[in-house]
């Protein structure tokens, strides 16, 4: 690289370092998550022919899984859309809880909800976990050091069920505006790297919902929750992961 160009690049880096680093972090996380999802397609895809019963899919999550903010929530939340697309061989249930955290010490811990108990009793063959958005709230993220241990405990809990389910982790959706304490910085620099590292250590796939929903602010009327179109994109990403497409 010519010296003049190199110096201009270095100068630009120092002048815009925070923006530059944010872009680099997002890009690296997206690439890594995408690689994990691709690898999982080969090794963990669900083959309906391998099951002699209806395949039970538990969608564990927060308000985004629940479908908060969607006009026709009952029919357009992502687990319902996923179930319609997968067809009669699958039974997909929505175990989303608005405001829920993965953290056990969160202000509304998923561990303490009836939905967690119901998801356990469902004895799923497939578990899709999408928790982390509410964990970024300041009152919750003060327990950030506990996030990975609590996530691993949840993975181990579901993995020990009689059906021995296949488990997918999801990266959170983008945060287009800080609201209710939910913020993009903690998602990108806190949640996603932790999910990625944990998935690698546990040998589990990650569904990269962050990338799937990035650059689409029009699908987030309140800047946090996707609308029906966004929920459809989520369902498509989850289906592709489950079926190994």
Question: What are the language-model segments listed below?
Answer:
Residues 146-149, 153-157, 190-197:
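Alpha-helical scaffolding segments of alpha/beta enzyme cores, especially the outer helices
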Residues 1-60, 64-73, 80-89, 120-125, ...:
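N-terminal secretory targeting modules
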Residues 50-58, 64-152, 176, 186:
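Conserved SGNH/GDSL esterase-like catalytic core that processes O-acyl groups on lipids
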Residues 61, 96, 171, 210:
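Active-site beta-alpha turn of Rossmann-fold NAD(P)-dependent dehydrogenases/reductases
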Residues 60, 128-130, 169-170, 206:
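Generic enzyme active-site microenvironment
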């Amino acid at each position: 690289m010519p010296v003049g160009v190199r110096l201009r690049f270095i100068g630009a880096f120092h002048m815009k370092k925070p923006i530059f680093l944010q872009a680099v972090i997002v890009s690296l996380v997206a690439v890594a998550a995408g690689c994990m999802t691709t690898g999982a397609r080969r090794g963990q895809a669900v083959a309906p022919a391998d099951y002699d019963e209806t395949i039970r899919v538990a969608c564990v999550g927060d308000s985004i899984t629940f479908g908060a903010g969607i006009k026709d929530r009952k029919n357009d939340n992502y687990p319902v859309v996923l179930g319609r697309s997968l067809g009669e061989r699958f039974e997909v249930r929505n175990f989303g809880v608005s405001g829920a955290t993965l953290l056990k010490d969160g202000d509304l811990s998923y561990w303490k909800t009836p939905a967690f108990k119901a998801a356990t009793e469902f004895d799923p063959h497939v578990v899709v976990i999408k928790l982390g958005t509410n964990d970024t709230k300041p009152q919750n993220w003060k327990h950030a050091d506990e996030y990975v241990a609590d996530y691993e405990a949840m993975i181990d809990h579901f993995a020990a069920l009689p059906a021995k389910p296949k488990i997918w982790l999801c990266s959170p959706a983008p945060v287009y505006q800080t609201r209710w304490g939910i913020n993009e910085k903690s998602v990108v620099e806190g949640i996603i790297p932790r999910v990625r590292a944990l998935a690698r250590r546990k040998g589990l796939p990650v569904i990269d919902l962050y990338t799937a929903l990035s650059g689409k602010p029009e699908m987030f009327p309140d800047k946090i929750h996707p609308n029906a179109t966004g929920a459809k994109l989520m369902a498509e990403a989850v289906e592709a992961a489950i079926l190994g497409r």
